[in-house]
């Protein structure tokens, strides 16, 4: 009762007086007047077409109404219309949802857009400070933007998240956090994800990435979850996310089994894409070059500023004969990663490299109770208190599988990289043997969630120190002979034997038998002859391959003379040389022409302009196709057009059997989803169907979605808005239309649409067959009408639809109560007066935060651990370490209702087969 009474008093005190003895007569006179006007309006129903135009006008006018206090032109850049619109949309999204994902394709100026948004928010006094978090290699670039736009930002490396978090907690301010290359935070179960979430919690956020999806569509949601605690935390949307992820898993399974045709895969990918965009479009800015060319407004602006895009030619595949190495190639593949490696029958095959060194926990003894106790202790010590044997097995297998796949990728990259990896692995295996024999202990990886994209070289992050048992990133298994089964030592020796056999097979294979390199040489000479002024970039995943190619080309007198090769290395002097020779955005007086060929790893494919080059050679195909997108994006930039066409060349072996084509298959499958969801300008791997002839396969080895012509959902409506602004009479009529319009229309479903406008934006809801949808793309599609369509008065059933809409529109809370929530509720009651009023409010806010699903999984687990490992007031002290007290003011923002204090613009009732 007391809680309800206090709530009533609180709301009552907020109330405004609207009627008293002094204004009674005027008040009721106005009521009668408004009632008569309302009745007149209802008798004179507005057509659905005019309503549709009104919604379009209100939607785009709100964005355009955003007054910018500065633009890129104020800081030495051009004011492109598409960038100005993105800046306005970004500010709108940040004010409405506390964050925005800027995901324009590579080369359209995402960093400029983000910098301009940051400067405007500072000038508008919406934020007090800017923090930028980015990879080390682009810190210099961001320091330049920092200086140019005068935003006085604190710039932190992604590798120093702990420093960023410490700074945020020690210096309380209203901030904007800019996260560049946000795709690095797609795994929401990692320590770094937990860190970035804590840094951003309660702050405004701009996440930047051209490639927000790496492995699954859940990647996109993980990035958005860093800042969004409102839109996608709605239970309706949570359920939709679960459904989408399930559909994707089913599609992937059918793809692997070749149950679907290529056309079916693409069709289903597009369906999944539409569902995803229906959830996130309001907090993502994503345009392709085709969007800019499709929009007459953007196209004219680009033409006016004499800005053209490069035409990217169809990618060309260069398959090379393996010749005498063909049998050795296949035999080696079968040893390190057999085609049916997931088949359990392989477990006892002594001819297969298992990667035993990376998964010793699988061999923990479990025969006796004491064995199980000791083994369980080791598992918990390595992976945490919640870990069990199943988790340890899964994590161990993940790291072993990763290392085998890494070996395959290096094998497919170059003979040199592969031979070096085998030698390194043999050395590491021999080191482990010495540790076991001499000291009876074993160093083991603590990481089970290895990210394929984060590792390019061998496991050289293991740092073994002779005089210390402190291993960076490792745990030491002591008394190893007593805790590991004899099968471990047998399989370990077998792995070592296989590695030595492979080394022996390949040790006499040198550059003279490297068919891939000879194919490259042949093509390079041809490129140089055909394109005299066109510079070339060769990309590889691996530094060893880059070194090998650079040294081999330098030794070839003809190529060295023709191309003057440059190798990209990680130092500032080399980076300046690369920019001087390959960056067309530099002042002409700073540009040089000393080098015509650049050989680089993917570290250079992000954050650097290389558009003086017109040819890209992918010497190997990454496991993740977003890497290839980023490679191409380095030379396909907005601004100066140097070439009519850009060329992409991909190198792959000509396989004569269905052996290991996993990289290509996986890349094509993922690329279909990526392009379906986000659209892309360019084919980057293959021409349609060309892969089949290359691999001589009876079934398709890959799928590629030809989606270059896909455009963003709002381009069509933006065109209507622009035409409306050119018709003065119609525009004036639409502008003078009153709000609070309510009509009924015929359609193929039962439902209701509402469009509202509030302080921070135009938003809406669609209730269709008892399911809520907040996607404006879907709502606009429903509102779309022909000029001759008629309106009808709302039916008697409208009130029940409105009630259903109100009930469903803001369902935020979770469907279940986790242990942490139950324990906190009990704890609050038990502690009573032992904690202060402020501390009780703190606990209540954490409870609400859990109900609204705003904390990470790790935070929830840590709260549960606090209860498990502590008692009384110590529990509270531990919780305060987990959830920062001041950040919980963010709960007030979460609880706010978009629909509260908003104005109803339009409400349309839909019935199928209704009585007119």
Residue ranges of each PLM-predicted region?
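Conserved Helicase C-terminal RecA-like lobe
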Residues: 57-79, 95-98, 105, 118, ...
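A short beta-strand element within the Helicase C-terminal
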Residues: 219-222, 608-621, 646-650
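SF2 helicase motor core recognition
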Residues: 164-167, 213-217, 547, 592, ...
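ATP-dependent helicase/translocase motor core
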Residues: 1-105, 112-123, 193, 497-500, ...
